[in-house]
Amino acid sequence: MSIALFPGSFDPLTNGHLDIIERASLMFDKVVVGVGYNTGKKALFTPEEKLALISEVVSDLPNVEVAIMHGLTVQFMAEIGARFIVRGLRNSKDFEYERDIAGVNSALADVETILLLAKPENQNISSSMVKEIGSMGADNMAKFVPKVVVDALKERLN
């Protein structure tokens, strides 16, 4: 069984993230969306809130699971039996970063990094941008995030 991990902070999940999840679900027997967190960063949503939001959004994808990650990515991959890491690339800056991380991960464990190019309509979407425009009261957030996330953002930011 081919198992892939799609890790991220997902604060919040964007349509770009969702596109990568959907495409990865067609490539692997199982995809685990790994909700990571950085205790040094102030997140808008808790890991548990992100897990609930993402689980609702991907509920129609039978081979996709959502879990909160602990420890190193490669350690979490061993726990879930994943050999592949899926990452999305929006631009060359993302590529440089992901290439370096892929090298470290492959040095630590027998893992392969699969890089998927963002679709043109998602290349400018980032969680930071979504939070910024959401905090300014933008009404058309559905262009950037799934509806359940729009509702959660409106509740959290207003």
Curated annotation (Swiss-Prot):
One of its GO terms (biological process) is coenzyme A biosynthetic process. Its main location: cytoplasm. Gene3D superfamilies: HUPs. ATP binds at residues 9-10, 17, 88-90, 98, 122-128. It is found in: Cytoplasm. It comes from the Bacteria. Its cofactor is Mg(2+). The record marks 17 as: Transition state stabilizer. Belongs to the bacterial CoaD family. Homohexamer. This is Phosphopantetheine adenylyltransferase. It comes from Leuconostoc citreum (strain KM20).
